Design a protein with these regions (language model features):
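N-terminal, Lys/Arg-enriched amphipathic/low-complexity engagement segments
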Residues: 35-91
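Short coil/turn segments at secondary-structure boundaries
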Residues: 74-75, 143-147, 161, 453-460
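Short amphipathic alpha-helical segments
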Residues: 55-58, 140, 433-437
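Gly/Ser/Thr/Ala-enriched C-terminal appendages of enzymes
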Residues: 2-33, 37, 47-48, 295-496
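Short acidic, Pro/Gly- and aromatic-enriched capping/linker segments at domain boundaries
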Residues: 99-105, 412-417
Length: 496
């Protein structure tokens, strides 16, 4: 059988058109021209009021191993027809650029850069696909997990989605993202080993079915597991499962730690109330009721509204697949490119869809934090790279489209969201531990007003442009429109 994975190179984890463009740049002598690209998304996933940035650790691993292997070169030559000096360039390829990004666990919002690449045109083009692949998936899962965490308060929350994930890599990295977003543990043993995430799990229906009866299965499980949670819905939750769990717990006494029971089907609100009553009457008032089965933040909110007696939640399919919105839609757009004198010139992408018009120029993003009612974020402020908010005492923030919507902020702190990750191709960022990332996410959560954290119809968090950045965008739009009109061979009557 052919070895499908001859090496562990991810460098060809890119779209063909990236290589096609690199070849054209190389042939025209443009491949070393300095450029700036930025990653952002246009819409808030799940109609959420916030998004949790994730994926940076995998980006770092990817960038540190970015090189074309001999098997890569052979494939590009034999199968795709690349040859000559271009292949030699790829053989000696090394990323020498700069990458800035939001920290993992940072709350980010639509239209603002969450990652910025400044590198040669060829370098920046090659890494687009992988960067978007990583950010789009992990940020989506971290956000979904954070939304689930927001509705269950301090109750425990386990990630149970491995078998429903879109393949093994998605399960592993999705688990990590879910942990950043708010889950307490995972059923995925490999993810526990790799990342140090606490692992949790009970039993499956198959174990109950494998024994003569449910009672025997529970007894067997209790003999081998001091911490016992019994799955009670294989046959009949209230007539069989819960009574048998209680019976085994009483039989075993101090020989086990009877943690509780798990419900995996049926009317969770009704069954949890009845099961709680039965456990309490049997003297197991401390026993917990765990729930699983196609849960998400909406189902959990509904169960809580029905006063379900559930203490812990196992969330699988709808978390690990981001079931209700399986794509974030982050894009990677050129913001600037150097001229013949290596001076960066603005670059803009226009569209008849106004939300798809990019904001030109190399930029920075500030989070504006005031001391009103404790530290609170007033909004994010996108400025051009040469702007600074040092020694600025009063800041006017206005909506970038509806410019009459504005406010003035005083006594604020401005924190830059994008921090250096790679400089001149070298890693300069100290990657925090996963628990530190998770704690950072919780710190950031406290900065948001409750109105932005609502699960349903949250208030829209302000993301504004500086006056200079806004004027620069308008100037570039007009410049491109005039250029198109001047050089277009076709005359069109535009509706605006």
């Amino acid at each position: 059988m052919t070895n499908l994975f001859q090496d562990d190179s991810l460098t060809l984890h890119t779209d063909l058109y990236q290589l096609n463009m690199m070849k054209a740049y190389f042939d025209d002598g443009l491949h070393e021209r300095r450029s700036v690209f930025e990653v952002f998304f246009r819409d808030m996933p799940f109609d959420s009021g916030f998004v949790v940035f994730a994926g940076l650790e995998r980006i770092i691993h990817y960038m540190q191993n970015l090189r074309f292997t001999e098997t890569d070169i052979a494939y590009l030559h034999d199968e795709l027809g690349f040859d000559g000096p271009f292949l030699e360039y790829l053989r000696n390829f090394k990323f020498k650029g700069n990458i800035l990004a939001a920290k993992e666990g940072e709350f980010v919002f639509k239209t603002e850069p969450v990652l910025q690449v400044e590198a040669s045109l060829a370098e920046a083009q090659l890494i687009e696909t992988a960067l978007l692949n990583i950010v789009n998936f992990q940020t989506l899962i971290a956000t979904k997990a954070a939304r689930i965490r927001s509705v269950i308060d301090d109750e425990t929350f386990a990630e149970f989605g491995t078998r429903r994930a879109q393949e093994m890599d998605a399960a592993i990295w999705g688990t990590r993202a879910a942990y950043i977003g708010g889950c307490d543990s995972t059923s995925n043993v490999r993810a526990g080993k790799i990342f140090g995430i606490p692992v949790s799990g009970t039993m499956a229906h198959a174990m109950v079915q494998a024994y003569r009866d449910e009672l025997e299965a529970f007894r067997s499980y209790a003999k081998t597991h001091f911490d016992s949670i019994f799955l009670v819905d294989t046959y009949d939750t209230l007539k069989s499962g819960v009574p048998n769990a209680i019976k085994v717990a009483k039989e075993m006494g101090d020989k086990i730690n009877f943690i509780g029971i798990r419900l995996d089907s049926g009317d969770m609100a009704f069954l949890s109330k009845k099961a709680r009553q039965m456990l309490d009457e049997a003297g197991f008032t401390e026993a917990k009721i765990f729930a699983s089965s196609d849960l998400d933040e909406h189902t959990i909110l509904s169960l809580k509204a029905q006063k379900a007696k559930i203490d812990s939640w196992g969330v699988g399919t709808k978390l690990i697949t981001a079931y209700d919105q399986p794509a974030l839609g982050a894009v990677y757009k050129m913001a600037a490119i150097a001229d013949e004198n290596d001076i960066l010139q603005d670059s803009i992408k226009l569209s008849s869809n106004t939300e798809k018009v990019s904001t030109p120029g190399k930029k920075k993003v500030y989070r504006i934090i005031t001391n009103e009612d404790g530290l609170k974020a007033e909004g994010d402020y996108i400025a051009l790279a040469d702007e600074s908010l040092e020694n600025v005492d009063k800041l006017t923030m206005f909506h970038p489209v509806h410019t009459y919507i504005m406010k003035t902020v005083e006594n604020f702190t401005a924190r830059e969201l994008l921090v250096p990750i790679f400089q001149n191709g070298e890693l300069v960022y100290d990657m925090p531990s996963l628990d530190e990332i998770k704690a950072y996410k919780e710190e950031n959560l406290a900065l948001l007003w409750d109105e932005y954290k609502r699960t349903v119809r949250p208030e829209q968090y302000p993301v504004d442009l500086s006056v200079k950045c806004w004027k620069n965008k308008m100037r570039n739009i007009e410049k491109v429109r005039k250029s198109v009109q001047l050089h277009s061979p076709v005359e069109l009557d535009m509706p605006f």
